[in-house]
A protein has these predicted regions:
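Cysteine-rich micro-motifs
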Residues: 42-56
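A glycine- and charged-residue-rich anion-binding loop/surface
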Residues: 5-20, 24-30, 37, 53-917
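Interaction interfaces in information-processing and related assembly proteins
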Residues: 1-2
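Cys/His-enriched microdomains
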Residues: 31-34, 47
Length: 917
């Protein structure tokens, strides 16, 4: 379904889709834009729609009140509460409830849930108002430039289910929005224009009315009314009003400042100016005129901002240099204010800057901010700017203060990483300057992804003259959203009723009878009920037997459980037959303990490391489990120990594990979006696993009744598997006890080998290590002394070739390579014409060591010799320098041939070198 055709359909019947009672009451007339053909409603006659108007409110606001960002919200929330709207707190900017989104991109997303590919609306109060902070990264390069673009912005959500108690529809919605503009802000009706438009998404669609004042879009009322497509659609059971208004713009229209950044970030920018000691008159006539003209001409010149600025400078009668000197610092302050606010909300809500997923865009803006500060020589810490935002927003978003320490920690770590990479970045920039080549956008993207180099850094160092206008857009598009993971299925099962899940009704059931509903491919059974837990949520399936035939896999397809049989005969099963199933108890118990341990470890890690820790993924099977958590760095041994101790303390406390099913909205309201550790739940009902308040998650897996049943949790290993993700491998219960016992046995073996007790094994090891180190030093001394005397003998035994070059080759299967490296070094020091080669057997491999004296290096290189000999021995080549190189191979049968034919090989290398010369 195309937007244009849908708009044409709705516009053909304006009285049905767009006309509201307010239009008749106030005298709004439908008009057609002569420039773009759009239809709009206004009281006064206009030749064109407001999309073609200039920002005439700059320096001349049409409102009776002057309101900054926070006070605009106070006025708006007061108005809607007086008009029977429930005020709710913002949702996280990290969109945990939608698997297809990393971030909350609009206020309506708060109430959207995906079920079977369709959007379902779940509105907790009706009607409601929410100050939703949203994140979008498709306009990064426009932030600061246009006066109105952001990476984070507050979308006021006026949301209503028209068909639920308290609901209303189009007439009341537009009446309220108009009343706020006129009665609260003091904007006359003649100033307001409503533009016809449409919205569509995930099978739902409807018409919308955007409202403008003096060229600035303030809000968009979307009326989601239908589902289906243009040729075949029906009215939704619940029609939804989604009015989204930009708080930044509402504040801007009341102040008439040059840009919306002045009102949005006013206190932050003013204090930031003082911190970096620069003087910018935010109310200067030049700024007002510049941004008014910029807004008018931006669409025409958006691919060549420099040319646009040159043209504006001519129109204003100032030089481009003078204009840029004023505008550029102001633009940069606005960028820094925007980017740091975005980081504050994202990190507070649990996202980490990284090279993967949603964290990718966070790292882009963080590094861009650092590069801009460096470019202008502004000595200020990002953490201090973060504090300015927290102070400004404390009445709207008091929760930000709670996370300030965590945000500072992450910002400091990321800033340190960026600083430590500067030397490499400078080296690359210097190389690019020398090449005098202009990098393409694709090359710049590759440089950022591989080396973390922002175009702002290259601009600062003179590598590029301008940042390509679409650089940040293309970069952001790579990491804006992600496709939900799809589970593999055997084949699509149809025509059977949902499987009754006995393991939920009675967690201890291990034997059951069931009727066969369907047989697939002769080896898959669908039963009417089952006690076999299927693979899901990172938990591996139960095994066991059905009628004595082994079950080797169990999967769930929507509401149907499918059992895989091992080597079943054709006559073993038939549809409608009653069969007996037995679940492998020891496997179920082991996996169950591992699953409960996963929940305990996850919260333990969050308590020890920080609030940014979320479950990234998990895997639980019979003998082993792993938990991947979001964390900025590899874990230290001390951190691992703390997490393990905390987890086992929870086990020892024998906390009850309670499992209840809630309506999804109820679960979210009770426990917050922290419940979605394992991802979004595509169901109206959510199964909540509550470990007595220690950990509360939405989970469909099997769990013990009390934490004490787990017995023991032992972390085996921790590693940083990707940027921003740390993996914990662990065992629980009997497997943990066996692991500890195995470690104890190994420790006893080591103690016995050292002639010590287990209690004194460390002391004995240190003593033995010290003795070994002393022996190594004595051996090295002996090698050096012996090699001194042998060097002369080697030189005397060497064979002389042309040009004075001499060579010596030897083979040894007893003495290690330390001796021959020392000897080779001595021999070429004594004889600059010597080529020295040693073949040394090291278990199944023959090592090659080659040295070339300083005079012989003029005609032959050690690296070439090592490579050729290694190839003869079945290796792939050697590596090293002109003086010294190493290599090797595994074909021991070729050793004697190499010794015998080395002179011929050397001569061949010399001949080829002379030809190349």
């Amino acid at each position: 379904m195309e937007k244009e055709s849908l708009l044409s359909l709705f516009s053909s019947n304006p009285d049905k889709y767009y006309k509201v009672s307010l239009f008749d009451e106030k005298g709004f007339k439908r008009q057609n834009c002569r420039l773009c053909g759009k239809f709009f409603w206004s009281i006064n006659y206009k030749e064109s729609c407001p999309e073609h108007e200039n920002y005439s409110f700059i320096d001349d606001p049409p409102t009776s009140k002057r309101l900054d960002f926070v006070n605009t919200w106070k006025e708006l929330s007061s108005f809607f509460r007086k008009n029977d709207h429930e005020l709710i707190q913002r949702y996280p900017v990290v969109c945990r409830w939608r698997e297809d989104l990393y971030f909350t991109i609009a206020s309506i997303v708060d109430f959207q849930r995906l079920m079977n590919g369709k959007i379902v609306f779940e509105i907790p109060k009706n009607p409601l108002i929410v100050p939703q902070m949203c994140l979008r990264f498709n306009d990064i390069e426009n932030v600061g430039l246009t006066g109105r673009h952001y990476t984070s912005f507050c979308m006021i959500g006026q949301t209503c289910n028209a068909d639920a108690p308290g609901g209303y529809w189009k007439d009341r919605c537009i009446e309220l929005d108009h009343a706020f503009l006129k009665n609260v802000l003091g904007i006359q009706s003649e100033e307001i224009t409503f533009v016809e438009d449409v919205w569509m998404g995930a099978g739902a669609f409807g018409n919308s009315l955007e409202y403008y004042v003096r060229g600035l879009e303030l809000g968009n009322a979307v009326f989601t009314e239908f589902e289906g497509d243009q040729s075949n659609y029906r009215t939704l059971d619940s029609r939804i009003i989604d009015m989204g208004a930009g708080l930044e713009r509402l504040s801007w229209i009341t102040m008439g400042t040059p840009t919306s950044y002045d009102t949005t970030f006013g206190p932050v920018i003013n204090k930031l100016k003082n911190m970096i000691n620069i003087d910018i008159d935010l109310n200067s006539e030049l700024l007002s005129q510049y941004f008014r003209i910029f807004a008018e001409k931006y669409s025409k010149y958006q691919n060549d901002i420099k040319l646009l600025k040159i043209n504006i400078s001519k129109e204003l009668g100032v030089s481009y240099e003078t204009l840029e000197k004023t505008i550029l610092p102001y633009e940069t302050l606005s960028v820094i204010a925007d980017h740091t606010r975005t980081l504050l909300f994202a990190i507070s809500d649990g996202s980490l800057p990284s090279n993967v997923g949603g964290g990718y865009n966070l790292r882009i803006i963080l590094r861009r901010t650092l590069a801009l500060l460096a470019r202008f020589g502004w000595n200020v810490n990002l953490e201090d700017i973060i504090d300015l935002h927290i102070e400004q927003l404390k009445s709207m978003y008091p929760e930000l203060k709670e996370h300030s320490n965590d945000v500072r920690t992450i910002i400091q770590i990321e800033s340190g990483r960026y600083g430590s990479s500067k030397e490499r970045m400078y080296s690359i920039a210097k190389s690019m300057l020398s090449s005098k080549k202009s990098p393409s956008v694709e090359h710049l993207i590759k440089m950022y992804e591989s080396d973390g180099i922002t175009p702002d850094f290259l601009l600062e160092n003179g590598v590029i003259e301008n940042i390509p206008p679409d650089f940040y857009l293309k970069l952001a598009e790579l990491h804006t959203s992600h496709e939900p993971k799809q589970a593999a299925v055997v084949e699509t099962v149809t025509g059977v009723r949902p499987t009754k899940l006995l393991y939920y009704e009675n967690a201890s059931i291990r034997e059951f009878d069931a009727r066969i509903l369907k047989i697939l491919n002769g080896k898959y059974l669908v039963l009417d009920q089952t006690a076999f837990y299927p693979r899901g949520g990172g938990q591996e399936p139960d095994f066991g037997y059905i009628e004595g035939v082994k079950i080797t896999d169990v999967v769930k397809q929507n509401d149907i459980v499918i059992h895989k049989l091992e080597n079943a005969s054709k006559d073993s099963f038939s549809e409608d037959k009653i069969v007996h199933g037995i679940v492998d108890n020891s496997r179920r118990v082991a996996i169950t303990k591992n699953h409960s341990a996963t929940h305990i470890l996850n919260s333990s890690a969050r308590n020890i490391l920080g609030s940014w820790v979320w479950q990234n993924s998990a895997f639980k099977e019979e003998n082993y489990a792993r938990l991947d958590i979001t964390h900025h760095s590899a874990l230290t041994r001390e951190e691992i120990r703390h997490i393990e101790n905390t987890a086992n303390d929870v086990v020892q406390r024998n906390l009850p594990i309670l499992i209840n099913v809630f309506e999804r909205s109820d679960a979210e309201n009770r426990y917050s979006f922290r419940i979605y550790q394992g991802g979004a739940v595509p169901s109206n009902n959510v199964r909540i696993v509550n470990i007595d308040g220690w950990d509360i998650e939405a989970c469909g897996g099997t769990h013990v009744n009390k934490t004490g049943e787990i017995g023991l949790i032992k972390i085996l290993k921790s590693e940083r598997i990707q940027d921003g993700v740390v993996r914990l491998e662990f065992v629980a219960g009997t497997n943990a006890v066996r692991y500890v016992q195995s470690q104890d046995s190994q420790l006893l073996h080591i103690a016995q080998s050292l002639g010590s007790s287990k209690e004194k094994v460390v002391e004995s090891f240190d003593k033995t290590s010290g003795e070994n180190e002393l022996m190594k030093r004595k051996f090295r001394t002996l090698v050096n002394k012996f090699s001194d005397s042998m060097a002369t003998i080697v030189s005397q035994k060497a064979t002389t070739l042309r040009s004075g070059l001499k060579f010596f080759i030897t083979y040894d299967d007893e003495i290690g390579d330390d001796y021959y490296i020392a000897l080779g070094e001595k021999t070429i020091d004594n004889d600059p014409f010597l080529v020295y080669v040693a073949l040394i057997q090291d278990q199944e491999r023959i090592k090659v060591i080659a040295f070339v004296g300083i005079e012989s290096r003029k005609i032959i290189k050690a690296s070439r010799i090592a490579k050729e000999v290694s190839l003869k021995l079945g290796g792939t080549g050697g590596g090293g320098t002109d003086k010294f190189a190493q290599g090797g191979g595994t074909d021991k049968s070729k050793v004697q041939e190499c010794l015998k034919n080395f002179e011929n090989l050397l001569t061949s290398i010399l001949d080829s070198s002379e030809k190349n010369d």
